[in-house]
C-alpha cells in the first residue's frame, strides 16, 4: 500500500512545475522559503520531499510546540532524513526561571547533531 502511494507521490512531484520551481529555490543554501497553503500531513510530506534534494540543514519553524511535535512525527514517517525537534525553552527570558534538565539536554543533543554536518531537518516552535 505504501509503495503504491509513494509511486503516485513521486509521479506528482516529478511532473509538477510548481514543485520543480520550489525545489530549485530550496536547493540554494541562502534561500529562505515560507510555505503556506498545504494543510494536514501534506506540508510535512512536501518539506520532506524538498529536503531530500538538499545536502544541508533545514529549519522548519512552527507557531506552537504542539504543531512542532506533529510536524516532527509526520516528517519521520515521510522521509529517511534525520529529523530533530528543538524544543521550546519553556519560559520567557524575563521570567528568570530555568528550564528542566531534560529540556536542556534535549536542546543540547540537537545542537550536537548539528555540529556533525548531518543534513538534518530541525523542527522548532516560535
Description of each model-found segment:
Residues 1-126:
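ASCE RecA-like P-loop NTPase motor cores
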Amino acid at each position: 500500500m505504501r509503495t503504491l502511494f509513494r509511486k503516485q507521490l513521486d509521479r506528482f512531484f516529478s511532473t509538477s512545475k510548481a514543485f520543480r520551481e520550489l525545489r530549485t529555490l530550496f536547493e540554494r543554501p541562502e534561500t529562505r522559503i515560507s510555505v503556506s497553503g498545504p494543510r494536514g500531513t501534506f506540508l510535512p510530506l512536501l518539506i520532506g520531499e524538498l529536503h531530500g534534494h538538499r545536502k544541508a540543514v533545514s529549519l522548519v519553524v512552527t507557531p506552537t510546540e504542539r504543531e512542532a511535535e506533529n510536524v516532527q512525527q509526520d516528517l519521520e514517517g515521510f522521509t529517511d532524513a534525520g529529523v530533530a525537534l528543538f524544543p521550546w525553552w519553556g519560559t520567557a527570558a524575563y521570567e528568570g526561571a530555568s528550564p528542566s534538565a531534560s529540556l536542556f539536554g534535549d536542546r543540547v543533543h540537537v545542537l550536537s547533531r548539528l555540529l556533525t554536518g548531518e543534513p538534518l531537518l530541525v523542527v522548532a516552535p516560535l
